[in-house]
Amino acid sequence: MKIFKNFIGLAALALCLGFASCGSDDDAPSYSNVAVSNSEMMTILKAKGYQFDENGKMLLDDKANSTSSLDLSGTKVDTAALKELSVFPNLKELNLSSNGYGETFDFSVLPAQITGIDLTNNDIYNYDNLVKVTVEENGDETVEPLHNITKLYLPEKAKYNIAQIMRFYRQNKSAIDGGTMDVEMQNGNGSLEKYNTLREIPNETLRECLKENYAELFSGDKINILNSATL
């Protein structure tokens, strides 16, 4: 009987230790699978209150897990570092306004989960890897989205872009008009307006000459770049 009681006691002790071990595992901090290796991005994120271990992996606490939108405006962060934002499990939107970006923004640097991006107050003209355009022998175009963007805020210079932005707009016009996609562009005053394809031609002589020869391209006194792209 004494041996049996000792056995029961040892079994109970082992069971308690097992529960304690499981509890300690559940309470252990969780970190991202990959590390943030870019020192500039690491500094920015630490300043915003995110924590990292000695290997650069981010602590997945309530703050990190609840982050669905991240404001990196004015940080001048290198676009090459944006891929590292995949450490956020629920990040969907990025504010990259006023970062001094010029000429070209490459959408391939964005983590796959990003669906919204603010690029206002930058000097971006080209938008690489937003769409893939395939032109058939008969001139027909197939436009394939390369990133699942449903919210896009553009700087004023985007109004001159036909190669990517206009085609992105044309491909998604019904969704934009229906309100399931939000695409806006800054006007000359810096305010955001719903994206459209009407463009002013300030030079009156040139405008009248174009209207005389290409009347089908115009809506009032403005040229419609959507029409010009179909010629």
Describe these PLM feature segments.
Residues 99-101, 111:
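Right-handed parallel beta-helix
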Residues 2, 22-93, 123, 134-135, ...:
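N-terminal capping/linker segments that flank leucine-rich repeat
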Residues 1-9:
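Bacterial N-terminal signal peptides that target proteins for export
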Residues 95-97:
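Alpha-helical adaptor scaffolds
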Residues 90, 112-113:
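Short "repeat-start/strand-capping" segments in structured domains, especially the N-termini
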Residues 17-21:
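C-terminal motif of bacterial Sec signal peptides marking the signal peptidase cleavage site
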Residues 85-86, 108-110:
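Low-complexity, polar/charged sequence tracts that form flexible coils or short amphipathic helices
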